[in-house]
């Protein structure tokens, strides 16, 4: 009889457990417990934050999916989750859209702290933190035999990114950045145009661009909600596609700006715009064409706080770019590097600059301006000396003729 009673009790327990989990994808041995911290998983994205809660432990605690809501908003259906029974264990999924995160009273706190950017340069860094909680409602009675459930979540967003464009012939590049403090994926574009209206994208001819050609550049962020703006912190150029190249020329860094660079918009929208004139690197002096690669360190700042991060400049002299040519990146971890081809410039040398003279030894040398000036001086001096010699000789002959007339023999006929 005892084995029969044991089998009967086991069957009753199995039926009660099955009834408790209501046929959801749960395991009685693993999930017959109250919720723990490991029962919530948070995914932080640029457009949405997703939370997955173990639904089996919620059922064991005596609640259903309709009892869980964001930040105590139990009367708002938009702040509730939905069940996914295609996973093990079954989960309740909550999704927060960052563009409307205040609708369920989620909290956004942006802190600005001193720090260094990817190149070791002192800069103000912004950190965005979005937080909230998921809970069950309080019972209407004075006491309750059910535990109250509370799940907390938080996502931190580092807002500084390195975007560089190293194949500017294609006039655009896009990158995706994944940061360690949560998953923050953003698309940044560096676009080049040949007009101030930013309507015609730049096409670089195979022969290269003439020197001093004006290029209009724009750094733009997409897939972001309206609370974020783009703030260009540091833009510079290198002769190679390596943003860590020891040789670099700064276009602008804070208030220090190249005289040929003009900033039109920065920190006021999701696009930063500036222009600069094409130049060549001296290291390419023996080449008919020079390559220039553009790189920018870009911040994302909250639209209300961008003006605090934008420097106030009052006729400051630009620092010499050579001072920073020996800087090396502090760290490139967590920053994305994109390559999109070089700006090609031509030297536009004149025939006078290319004129050469043949040497008997089949060697060639080039007449520079100093040698030309010396030769001209010698020719002028020789011509002047010859003129003085001819004048002196003429005067001497005239004097000799006059002397012969005065000292001549007296003609007896005149007697």
Curated annotation (Swiss-Prot):
The keyword Transferase does not apply. Residues 20-372 are extracellular. InterPro entries: ZP-C, ZP-C_dom, ZP_dom. It comes from the Eukaryota. Keywords: Cytoplasmic vesicle, Disulfide bond, Extracellular matrix, Membrane, Secreted, Signal, Transmembrane, Transmembrane helix. Residues 394-415 are cytoplasmic. The keyword Membrane applies. The record marks 319-320 as: Cleavage. Disulfide bonds join 44-155, 79-104, 235-296, 255-313. Residues 43-320 form the ZP domain. Pfam families: Zona_pellucida (PF00100). Gene3D superfamilies: Zona pellucida, ZP-C domain. Proteolytically cleaved before the transmembrane segment to yield the secreted form found in the extracellular matrix of the cupula. Residues 1-19 form the signal peptide. One of its GO terms (cellular component) is cytoplasmic vesicle membrane. The chain crosses the membrane at residues 373-393. Glycoprotein which is a component of the gelatinous extracellular matrix in the cupulae of the vestibular organ. This is Zona pellucida-like domain-containing protein 1. It comes from Xenopus laevis. The gene is zpld1.
């Amino acid at each position: 009889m005892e084995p029969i009673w044991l089998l009967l009790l086991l069957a009753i327990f199995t039926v009660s457990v099955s009834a408790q989990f209501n046929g959801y994808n749960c395991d009685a041995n693993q999930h017959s417990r109250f919720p723990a911290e490991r029962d919530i998983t948070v995914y932080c994205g640029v457009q949405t934050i997703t939370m997955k809660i173990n639904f089996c432990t919620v059922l064991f605690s005596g609640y259903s999916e309709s009892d869980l809501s964001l930040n105590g908003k139990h009367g708002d259906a938009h702040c509730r989750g939905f069940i996914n029974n295609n996973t093990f264990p079954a989960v309740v999924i909550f999704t927060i859209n960052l563009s409307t995160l205040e609708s369920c009273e989620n909290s956004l706190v942006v802190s600005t702290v001193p720090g260094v950017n990817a190149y070791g340069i002192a800069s103000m860094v912004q950190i965005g933190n979005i937080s909230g909680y998921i809970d069950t409602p309080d019972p209407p009675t004075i006491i309750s035999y059910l535990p109250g459930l509370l799940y907390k979540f938080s996502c931190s967003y580092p807002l500084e990114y390195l975007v560089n464009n190293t194949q500017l012939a294609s006039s655009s590049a896009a990158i995706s950045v994944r940061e360690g403090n949560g998953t923050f994926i953003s698309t940044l574009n560096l676009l080049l145009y040949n007009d101030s209206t930013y309507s015609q994208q730049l096409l670089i001819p195979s022969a290269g661009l003439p020197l001093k050609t004006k290029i209009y550049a724009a750094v733009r962020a997409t897939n972001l909600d309206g609370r974020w703006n783009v703030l260009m912190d540091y833009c510079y150029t290198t002769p190679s596609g390596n943003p860590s190249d020891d040789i670099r020329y700064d276009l602008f860094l804070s208030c220090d700006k190249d005289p040929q660079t003009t900033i039109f918009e920065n920190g006021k929208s999701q696009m930063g715009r500036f222009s600069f004139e094409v130049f060549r690197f001296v290291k390419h002096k023996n080449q008919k064409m020079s390559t220039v690669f553009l790189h920018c360190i870009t911040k994302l700042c909250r639209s209300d706080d961008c003006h605090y991060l934008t420097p106030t400049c009052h006729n400051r002299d630009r620092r010499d770019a050579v001072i920073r040519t020996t800087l090396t990146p502090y760290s490139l971890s967590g920053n994305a590097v994109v390559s999109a081809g070089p700006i090609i410039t031509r030297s536009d040398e004149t025939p006078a600059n290319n004129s050469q003279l043949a040497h008997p030894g089949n060697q060639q040398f080039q007449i520079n301006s100093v040698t030309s000036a010396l030769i001209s001086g010698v020719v002028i001096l020789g011509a002047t000396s010859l003129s003085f010699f001819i004048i002196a000789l003429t005067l001497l002959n005239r004097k000799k003729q006059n002397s012969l007339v005065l000292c001549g023999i007296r003609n007896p006929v005149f007697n």
